[in-house]
Amino acid sequence: MEFHLEHPLSHSSLHNNFNDDTDYETLPHSLFLVEFQHMPSSHYFHSLKSSAFLLSNRNQAISSITQYSRKFDDPSLTYLAVNYLDRFLSSEDMPQSKPWILKLISLSCVSLSAKMRKPDMSVSDLPVEGEFFDAQMIERMENVILGALKWRMRSVTPFSFLAFFISLFELKEEDPLLLKHSLKSQTSDLTFSLQHDISFLEFKPSVIAGAALLFASFELCPLQFPCFSNRINQCTYVNKDELMECYKAIQERDIIVGENEGSTETAVNVLDQQFSSCESDKSITITASSSPKRRKTSTRRY
């Protein structure tokens, strides 16, 4: 069965639709509990910041993954391959004397991702022209990567939480389905672009999903933004400080690439307030016997 980023769990049919009758006690429970298992190790972000060699390796590998996966014309396949790459590099030391290994790792990540996305795919389908890697070398490296990832190939990513977060919104539009589609589309495009930025490696997938969705919602329907923010913050698995920090990181990135600074500053002020217009919203409580440890975030001041 073809793997979809939005439905990482085996029982994907459970995630196809979210509505007012969704059992929030059980549906997202497992996703929030296991998401940290599909992240790079906790030291990876700081290692990349402090080591030009490691950062260069990651950039080169992502460039190779983009090249190798181009023939498939599938952004989700590329995203999944980079997820495998980051998780692998965070657990293994790269030999500096063998730069060709980086290409083999990149190609193997694409191969694994392609097999998840396209079950009928074989190694012979990979674009290996001009490379000296044969099928046996690729399969051996695949096994090394699988071991490092503990065979957790159904990655929990920000896309896994989009439908859940959107379902929390009370859309006040003539065509709520169209707005949902627009929110999902714009948030997805933003999430794809964030993956290359190491600043977002320290945030949990659910936090990235919530922050990216809020960023998209402010652009698409700013008048409803306060209520949208309140609804996401009421989910007890969402840490408000982490959400705020990730949201600000997206804004900083947006400003750097030339977007309007004034509108994003307005969104920061709105997000950091309590919204009286949404006081009637009921708290969405998700309980669990144990909760994953809060991921340490940057202490930057804004």
Swiss-Prot record:
InterPro entries from the entry? Cyclin, Cyclin-like_dom, Cyclin-like_sf, Cyclin_C-dom, Cyclin_N
Q: Keywords on this record?
A: Cell cycle, Cell division, Cyclin
The superkingdom listed in its UniProt entry is Eukaryota
Q: Which residues form the signal peptide?
A: none
Q: Name one GO biological process term.
A: cell division
Q: Does the keyword Cell division apply?
A: yes
Return any one Pfam family short name.
Answer: Cyclin_N
- Please report which protein family the annotation says this sequence is part of: Belongs to the cyclin family. Cyclin D subfamily.
Q: What is the protein's name according to its record?
A: Putative cyclin-D6-1
Taxonomic lineage is: Eukaryota, Viridiplantae, Streptophyta, Embryophyta, Tracheophyta
Name the gene: CYCD6-1
